[in-house]
């Protein structure tokens, strides 16, 4: 199952659940295909997006101040990157890092901001391979408002995160999903997101389609 372990857990829980609260009609249709009774499914909206729009301007201003104090310039050439999925450990994370390194060197006028997951399988590789590149900013895991501020201002997002896949379309930010399977289909269906897996060539090719343009041309 991918994504792992979430999809396994969801499948197990679905077998015994009496009620199913689906964020969207797309999710409801997926449950119906799994032979869940229609009268057990309720479309209730997405609480992740609710939380996103509950952030106050004061909180967003604090996030802006955080980056200013840490000498991280947030401009229209910002790329946000997150990668931590268990299924991407090993050779996959190596290919992802190779792609990031290539892009950062070629587009050295862009800023690549990477909140690094504390898992040693991820952290050690990111710091050993990317810390010498001046336009890559490796950060500790960010508080939620600080991450939202980056999404709001990013020219491009590269991620294997489930949550960011849900949130990025709210900002119309082009997003490359570094997975081979995703349970979040909505962003892909509306054209904001694209599956690229951990494929070096696909990551580079799709990123370059965005990075060669002005942000005003890429916001969807």
Language-model segments: residues:
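Nucleotide-activated sugar donor-binding and catalytic core shared by glycosyltransferases
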Residues: 1-114, 119-220
């Amino acid at each position: 199952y991918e994504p792992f372990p979430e999809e396994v857990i969801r499948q197990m829980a679905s077998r015994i659940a009496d009620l199913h609260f689906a964020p969207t009609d797309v999710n409801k249709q997926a449950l119906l295909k799994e032979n869940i009774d229609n009268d057990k499914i309720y479309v209730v909206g997405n609480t992740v997006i609710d939380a996103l729009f509950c952030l106050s301007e004061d909180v967003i201003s604090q996030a802006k101040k955080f980056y200013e104090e840490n000498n991280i310039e947030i401009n229209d050439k910002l790329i946000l990157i997150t990668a931590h999925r268990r299924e991407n450990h090993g050779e996959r994370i190596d290919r992802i890092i190779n792609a990031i390194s290539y892009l950062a060197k070629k587009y050295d006028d862009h800023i690549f901001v990477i909140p690094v997951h504390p898992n040693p399988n991820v952290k050690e590789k990111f710091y050993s391979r990317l810390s010498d590149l001046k336009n890559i900013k490796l950060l500790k895991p960010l508080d939620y408002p600080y991450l939202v501020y980056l999404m709001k201002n990013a020219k491009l997002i590269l991620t294997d995160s489930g949550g960011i896949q849900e949130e990025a379309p709210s900002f119309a930010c082009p997003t490359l999903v570094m997975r081979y399977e995703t349970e979040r289909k909505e962003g892909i269906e509306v054209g904001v997101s694209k599956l690229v897996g951990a494929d070096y060539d696909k990551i580079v090719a799709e990123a370059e389609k965005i990075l060669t343009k002005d942000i005003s041309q890429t916001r969807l």
